[in-house]
Amino acid sequence: MKLKEYILKNECLEIHVCNLGGIIKNLFVRDCKWKQTDVVLGFDTVEQYAEPAYLNNYPYFGALIGRYGNRIKDAAFEINGQTFSLDKNDNGNCLHSGSAGFDKRIWDVEQPDDEHLLLRLTDQDGEGGFPGTLDVTVRYSIEQNVFRVIHEATCDKA
């Protein structure tokens, strides 16, 4: 697993993002005296997110959640009469897409400049039990004191 940390930075904000799960590791904001404070709960190093203590316990610190966020009861759902069985990772239910959700995956990352980051991931048909190939793009950007997160996804099946 090749971990990498990316930094978005301007005069107001500094954001550290990991390619594992698109995790927002740090978000430094400035107070009225211009002192920086990290307002994100998480670990000190990127490597700690790849350790079994994190990966096997599902804390989801700062991570992108998907393909589905929340619990699916009994880890199964039905579309047009077809039942889809999912990974059971939460007392017989499927939480945040199971043990191989987006939070546990290495994303492809492009950083065109200091204020923009583009993350991409393809989730193949049947991964985790979900139907359809899903192409996901997440954009992190900062402008002055605004941090934006834009999610886009397309799937080839309903």
State where each predicted segment sits:
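Surface-exposed acidic/polar loop and edge beta-strand patches at domain peripheries
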Residues: 1-158
